[in-house]
Every structure is written in structure tokens, then in C-alpha cells.
């Protein structure tokens, strides 16, 4: 019997969500820390670059939970390539929790990815406060100056 990897649960949850919304993927590239999917929809083609963290890195007294996503040199090269080729690109970051049912994901669109790459970021910290409906993506200057990404955003 084939065994499943931890990443199968996280990537599978995102793919299941998309399929339930009538969006069918084709796997383009698979690796230990990321997966890249290509989608064809009635609104056009797009690439989805997925990464996950299985648990938050911190839970502090301010009520924030944070996940840090590191990008390898290969990841950054691939993202830059997609942007240069003017591909429709989304980056999905799966924010796992110890109770899998409490896990969430956020989606960065190409313009936001371009901003992060332009800032020389090799990692992205995603945080959310307990009662908020937006993720914070730190670009520089801490949480107060962070990009605010709605939790209900589509790919």
C-alpha cells in the first residue's frame, strides 16, 4: 500500500475546494515544499503555486497566529519566470493548524507577488488576528503596514 505524505493533505484540500467550484487542474510540477498547478477555466488559464505550513510558528498575547513561508532560489526563479512571461499567476499559502479543520489558506495575486519579489523577500510571514477577516502579509514595517488580503479571496 502506498503511504501518503503530509503535503498530500494540504495540497489535496486546496484542490478539492477548486474542484468543488468546477475548476479542474493539471499538475505541472511537484516537489517536497511546493506544487505548481495549471488550470483552464472559462475565464482563462492560470497557474497556482502552492506552499503550506502545517502549524503556526507563533501564537502571541496579541491574539495573532503567524506562519512563515520560505522560498528557495528555485521557487523565486520560477515565480519571476511566470511574471516575466505575463502568466496569470496566483500563490496559495496554506496556513495549517493542529486541528486540520481549522486550517485556512490565503491567495496572493500576481501584483502582490511582484511587490514581494521587488522587495527582495525570500520568505513571507502571514498572520491573522482572531476576529479579523483579513490576513496580513508583512512587506516591511511590521503588521501595521502589512498588505491586507481578504480571507474570502478566490484564486
Q: What do the PLM-derived regions correspond to, one by one?
A:
Residues 1-44, 56:
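Acidic-basic catalytic patches of nuclease active cores, encompassing PD-(D/E)XK
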Residues 37-72:
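Conserved catalytic cores of phosphodiester-cleaving nucleases, focusing on short active-site segments
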Residues 54, 97-99, 114:
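Short loop/turn segments at secondary-structure transitions that flank enzyme active sites
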Residues 71, 76, 84-89, 103, ...:
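Electrostatic, structured charged patches in enzyme active sites and in nucleic-acid/phosphate-binding
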Residues 81-108:
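Nucleic-acid nuclease catalytic cores
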Residues 103-155:
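Non-catalytic C-terminal interaction segments of nucleic acid-processing enzymes
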Amino acid at each position: 500500500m502506498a503511504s501518503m505524505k503530509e503535503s498530500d493533505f494540504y495540497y489535496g484540500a486546496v484542490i478539492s475546494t477548486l474542484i468543488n467550484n468546477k475548476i479542474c487542474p493539471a499538475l505541472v510540477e511537484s516537489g517536497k515544499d511546493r506544487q505548481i498547478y495549471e488550470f483552464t477555466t472559462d475565464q482563462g488559464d492560470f497557474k497556482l503555486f502552492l506552499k503550506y505550513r502545517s502549524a503556526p510558528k507563533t501564537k502571541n498575547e496579541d491574539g495573532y497566529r503567524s506562519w512563515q513561508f520560505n522560498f528557495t532560489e528555485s521557487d523565486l526563479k520560477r515565480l519571476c519566470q511566470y511574471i516575466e512571461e505575463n502568466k496569470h499567476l496566483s500563490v496559495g499559502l496554506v496556513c495549517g493548524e493542529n486541528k486540520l479543520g481549522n486550517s485556512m489558506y490565503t491567495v496572493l495575486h500576481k501584483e502582490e507577488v511582484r511587490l514581494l519579489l521587488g522587495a527582495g523577500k525570500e520568505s513571507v510571514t502571514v498572520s491573522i488576528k482572531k476576529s479579523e477577516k483579513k490576513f496580513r502579509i508583512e512587506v516591511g514595517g511590521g503588521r501595521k503596514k502589512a498588505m491586507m488580503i481578504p480571507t474570502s479571496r478566490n484564486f
